[in-house]
Amino acid sequence: MERKVAELELGLFTSGYQRYPLEQAFEDASRFGYDYIELWGGYPHAYVEDLTARGVGEIDRLIQKYRMPVKCFTPEHNGYPFNYMAGDEFQWERSMVYLEKAIELTAAWGAPMMLFSAGHAGVSDDRT
């Protein structure tokens, strides 16, 4: 029985470019033949609160200039100040607002998915 293999797409995750201008990641993705960008949502490129305040115009410009879609947004949220697995109820609620903003931003540039991972609750916290 012949099995068909789904077409593979390769994305460039921008976290490794955090010490470079974001445009460098888009330029490299285009130059090296990547299919899409997985945009890391941390400083200095795509931090959720900054994008909420400034808008997504710069990212839209890069998408258009390099014809390189953002197919996944990965907001930074496993460290201070946002980690929904640690802290008190206030921190949890604040983290939820942050992640809701991230979902809205993901939709703003048409990315079909947002990736986030479970944070760490800490070794001394009682979670029973």
Model regions: which residues?
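Aromatic-lined carbohydrate-binding surfaces of glycoside hydrolases
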Residues: 77-81
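Hydrophobic faces of well-ordered beta-strands that scaffold small-molecule active sites
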Residues: 8-15, 35-39, 68-75, 114-116
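Residue-level recognition of alpha-helix initiation/capping sites
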Residues: 19-20, 53-54, 97
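Glycine-rich, proline-tolerant flexible connector loops at the mouths of alpha/beta enzymes
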Residues: 38-65, 118-125
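Active-site acidic/histidine proton-transfer and metal-coordination neighborhood
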Residues: 23, 62-66, 82-128
